Amino acid sequence: MKKLLTLLLAFSIMPAFADMSGNVAYTSDYMWRGQSQSLGGGAFQAGVELDYEGFFVGAWASEVDFGDDSASLEYDLYGGYNFQVSDKLSMSVGVMQYRWDDNDIEMVEEAFAHFSTRLVDFQYAVDTDNSDNDYMELRLKAPFVDVVGVEFVYGRFPDDSTWKGLNLSKSWDKVDLGLMIMEDAKDGQFSDNVSLTLAYKL
């Protein structure tokens, strides 16, 4: 938790001309691309982002648990550019680095493109060092649902392994609540793959 707070403080010294946003969160299970990154346990998370005329840079961090004495913290650095393709389609392109507080775990770098409409999000990420780690994700948003946000997620890897999930979300002024029900990419089971996340916007 102290490492997460340190990252937030580092980003607090930033140019005044950029818009800064951030959040802190707790999740009952840190799930990423169809697999738990915390062995089914809880994790504190935090993120901060700077935006200026479409350009963005940010950092995000989470506690992790891989079942050994290796990494206890993941921290991701990213940057890119958002723009409107048309009235109904927006796009962002950028680069993201995944890092861990263990020198034995190699940094992973991805280039990504993200397309978004009112009802559909599509993302493709390319691992700059290993194409076996490329990733595609499709998110379908349920229309005409005002009480909660409903989103169906489908992810696919180059080896044809896939995962599916259902996201339910509710937002208030500074609080976001999310529930994910996920099919594990390894065993294809939905059982026990449920994560509840509470986030507070800074």
Residue ranges: model-predicted function:
Residues 9-17:
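Hydrophobic core
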